[in-house]
Amino acid sequence: MGLSFTKLFSRLFAKKEMRILMVGLDAAGKTTILYQLKLGEIVTTIPTIGFNVETVEYQYISFTVWDVGGQDKIRPLWRHYFQNTQGLIFVVDSNDRDRVVEARDELHRMLNEDELRDAVLLVFANKQDLPNAMNAAEITDKHGLHSLRQRHWYIQSTCATSGEGLYEGLDWLSNNIANKA
């Protein structure tokens, strides 16, 4: 009896740790999102060559978030970050209509990787504050998300600079990763 109570208590109140990989094309807003979550403020960013990694504490969960640069020359390196990833955040620049096909192709290429087969997918439809931004439904359609029948996925409209939508996305991510455990 005591052991089961201890397990229940630790399951409810112990800090959970989750490994999250955040990728997307260059200039989608990944680093801005990372530091908005970590610091609650906008930081001046430069294109990420390599990666940034931060621990984001949110609702009894410790998210280790790997933000990996998105320039086309370094995308082949993404695969080195796949191991043990529980959640994949794919950040889309909702205003970048010219690279929708490129973003879709990169997303599907990653989702076909064996090391990511169990990872849940959160798509951040970022830059929703811009006047020409595609909404979440349009991004869902253009990225072929409905074809992902064997994967838990969710799309969240966001604005990295204001923080709008980011924590709603983390809520979904934490609930879905915890349910798989």
Curated annotation (Swiss-Prot):
Belongs to the small GTPase superfamily. Arf family. Its main location: Golgi. GTP-binding protein involved in protein trafficking; may modulate vesicle budding and uncoating within the Golgi apparatus. The gene is ARF1. GO terms for molecular function: GTP binding; GTPase activity. GO terms for cellular component: Golgi apparatus. Its EC number is 3.6.5.2. One of its GO terms (biological process) is vesicle-mediated transport. The lineage of its organism: Eukaryota, Viridiplantae, Streptophyta, Embryophyta, Tracheophyta. Keywords: ER-Golgi transport, Golgi apparatus, GTP-binding, Hydrolase, Lipoprotein, Myristate, Nucleotide-binding, Protein transport, Transport. It is found in: Golgi apparatus. InterPro entries: Arf1-5-like, P-loop_NTPase, Small_GTP-bd, Small_GTPase_ARF, Small_GTPase_ARF/SAR. GTP binds at residues 24-31, 67-71, 126-129. It holds the Pfam family Arf. It catalyses: GTP + H2O = GDP + phosphate + H(+). This is ADP-ribosylation factor 1. PROSITE patterns: ARF (PS51417). Gene3D superfamilies: P-loop containing nucleotide triphosphate hydrolases. A lipid is attached at residue 2 (N-myristoyl glycine). It comes from the Eukaryota. The keyword Transport applies.
